[in-house]
Amino acid sequence: MEVDLRKLKLSDQLKKVNEIIDSDFIETSIITNEEAIIKIIPMQILNKKIKCKMKFIDDCWKVNLVAKEVA
């Protein structure tokens, strides 16, 4: 699943990222133009079994989240 948050306000992006992290996903990509999101994601997934890979491409961030264990 790929979620593009670039057209949302920062507060709406934060809500959506929280929803995604708290959901039962196997793999998802988040595209954002807000650096604040990039700083918050690692803190939010610290105690969860989620791998994170971030790339800066074409003036936006792409964050790939992968669940380490699939139930």
How should these model regions be labeled?
Residues 9, 36, 69-71:
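Residues that cap or initiate secondary-structure elements
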Residues 22, 44-46, 55-57:
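A generic structural signal for short, solvent-exposed coil/turn residues
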Residues 1-25:
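An N-terminal amphipathic alpha-helical segment
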Residues 49-71:
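C-terminal edge-of-domain segments
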Residues 11-19, 35-50:
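Amphipathic alpha-helical interaction surfaces in cytosolic regulatory modules
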Residues 4-7, 42, 60-62:
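Intrinsically disordered, low-complexity sequence elements enriched in Ser/Thr/Gly/Pro
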